[in-house]
Amino acid sequence: MFEKIEELERRYQELEALLADPAVLGNQPEFRKLSREHSDLSALVESYRNYKKVLVEITGNRELLADPEMKEMAEAELEALEEQQAALEAEIKLLLLPKDPNDNKSVILEIRAGTGGDEAALFAGDLFRMYGRYAESNRWRVEVISASESEKGGFKEIVASVEGDGVFAKLKYESGTHRVQRVPETEAQGRIHTSACTVAIMPEAEDVDIDINPADLKIDVYRSSGAGGQHVNTTDSAVRITHLPTGTVVACQEERSQIKNRAKAMKVLKTRILDTIMQEQSARLAADRKQQVGSGDRSERIRTYNFPQGRMTDHRIGLTLYRLDAIMAGDIGEITDSLRVYYQMEALKQQSEAA
């Protein structure tokens, strides 16, 4: 393990020299590429350097054990240093796990109302606002691509892009069925109703990820319409694109410009097709190892939001928090961080079992 880290530390030093080279500074694409690599290695190199410092201190304290006057102090320090050593070793093992190549990507977020009718649509709107506020706190940009509004408020379906650094890394475990338990405003008897929404988080496809043959596309244009079905535009600006080989259909009418709607629809189409490929690969891997870890299975019920109790429970990791108001206001960092740590530990366990 440490030979590999020494090699990576040497590469880190090379990158520092390259990033200071005027020739690299003048080549922005190359500079950005090397900067990303430097950034990816920085946490590992810092932890490894701290680890080496702790080893030196441990050696020094062990030598002091032979001195009767220093023995008691050396033993106390040695215990603390050995705890640091163990913690840094665990941290380094996590940092050495293979990186998900999609982690730095922006995402397409899709929320669909499921069982529960109007109440499910209202909850879809609540979830969209929750993710929107979380995105805002991370300085990400959210742009609605398509939305089907419910007559009572909320959304039957909403599709949006969330753009920024590391969006997929933080949101990828949000895919699945989100269940809500609360008393609807129209419920005279005060009975708690249960409804659900499905969330899909897909890494945004880039041109290098997927190549689509234009001959495989059927493109329709039509007039955009509002929530009640009335036409809100006098020109054929709305666009529907069908990918014939897979039957994937994407429509977009949010923009007044047909060109912009077409570009947005193509972005979602590519992302959905890439996501289908990734899901198939994930299923094959799961079959090979007889279990599916952190796959984001869309049919899986992952979370319950219980409004009467002010409680949120994530069923995958058994995490329960009694601060639902803050969570619905976008304070979901503790949830996303806990999920990332859990699945990292699962991956580490699998790596150890395979070794």
Curated annotation (Swiss-Prot):
Family matches, as SMART domains: PCRF
Q: What keywords would UniProt list here?
A: Cytoplasm, Methylation, Protein biosynthesis
Give the GO cellular component terms, alphabetically: cytoplasm
PROSITE patterns for the chain? RF_PROK_I
**Post-translational changes noted in the entry:** Methylated by PrmC. Methylation increases the termination efficiency of RF1.
Sites where N5-methylglutamine occurs are at 230
Which SUPFAM superfamilies does the record match to this protein?
Answer: Release factor (SSF75620)
Q: Where in the cell is it found?
A: Cytoplasm
Q: Which InterPro entries match?
A: PCRF, Pep_chain_release_fac_I, Pep_chain_release_fac_I_sf, Prokaryotic/Mito_RF, RF-1
Which GO molecular function terms does the record list?
translation release factor activity, codon specific
Pfam families (UniProt xref)? PCRF, RF-1
HAMAP family cross-referenced by the UniProt entry: Rel_fac_1
Note the NCBIfam families from the entry. prfA, PRK00591.1
Q: Which family does it belong to?
A: Belongs to the prokaryotic/mitochondrial release factor family.
Q: What does this protein do?
A: Peptide chain release factor 1 directs the termination of translation in response to the peptide chain termination codons UAG and UAA.
Task: Please identify the protein, giving its name as recorded.
Answer: Peptide chain release factor 1
Q: What is the originating organism of this protein? A: Geotalea uraniireducens (strain Rf4)
Q: Which gene encodes it?
A: prfA
